[in-house]
């Protein structure tokens, strides 16, 4: 069965290029703020703080992701590249920035983080659609029913890229420019992100100790990433 061929999404608006990745990130932060605000207000708390927290998370997340990527690659110049929005770096940077903003507003981190738990899961699911839109973060070669080839991915899923950039072996007999079908791990993560959101949304009204729901999110997110890493093509497994 022939694999589905992926083509990246981009729209030129005058001098501005709007990419699927950019739209995915924008929607992720907007949806995250909406969900977190709704949870706080449902608990009878002031949700206005989430505007400041979201801005802090955006700035801290972007800086953390780029810095983490530069450390992984050993290239300080990677901070200025268009690539390198690494999840774990973004999560760490976003949390650090959010803690500072929350403390500045005189609120408790555990109180806000519980409201952010389902919001983070929803934002993650939506954000991964941005990775899909540009053809980034795909998986290992596969010829199954859901296999997808990325001839214009970031980077294209060619033999040369899979071997040189991701360290995969066993394809030396194929021409370097051969485009391989792979696991669409971006879509797997989107689906798992929505499952996490459904679980956390169901648990949001449970009266447990402050910080409990955020802890559940961390466990679910860790399990999700652990599982998907076995299918991802990237060579920075378990840390990227």
Stretches with model-predicted labels:
Residues 1-240:
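A feature for loop-to-transmembrane-helix boundaries and adjacent hydrophobic helices
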């Amino acid at each position: 069965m022939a694999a589905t061929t992926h083509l990246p999404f981009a729209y030129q608006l005058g001098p501005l290029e709007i990419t699927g990745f950019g739209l995915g990130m924008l929607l992720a932060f907007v949806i995250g703020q909406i969900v977190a605000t709704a949870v706080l207000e449902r608990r009878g708390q002031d949700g206005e703080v989430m505007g400041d927290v979201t801005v802090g998370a955006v700035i801290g997340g972007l800086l953390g992701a780029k810095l983490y990527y530069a450390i992984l690659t050993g290239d300080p110049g990677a901070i200025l590249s268009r690539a390198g929005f690494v999840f774990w770096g973004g999560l760490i940077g976003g949390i650090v920035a959010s803690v500072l903003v929350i403390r500045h507003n005189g609120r408790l981190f555990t109180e806000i983080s519980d409201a952010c738990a389902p919001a983070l899961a929803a934002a993650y699911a939506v954000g991964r659609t941005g990775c899909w839109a540009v053809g980034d973060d795909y998986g290992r070669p596969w010829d199954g029913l859901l296999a997808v080839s990325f001839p214009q991915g970031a980077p294209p899923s060619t033999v040369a890229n899979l071997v040189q950039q991701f360290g995969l072996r066993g394809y030396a007999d194929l021409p370097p420019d051969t485009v391989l079908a792979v696991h669409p791990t971006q879509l797997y993560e989107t689906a798992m992100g929505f499952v996490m959101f459904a679980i956390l949304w169901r648990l949001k009204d449970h009266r447990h100790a402050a910080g409990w729901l955020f802890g559940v999110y961390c466990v679910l997110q860790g399990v999700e990433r652990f599982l998907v890493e076995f299918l991802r093509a990237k060579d920075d497994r378990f840390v990227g």
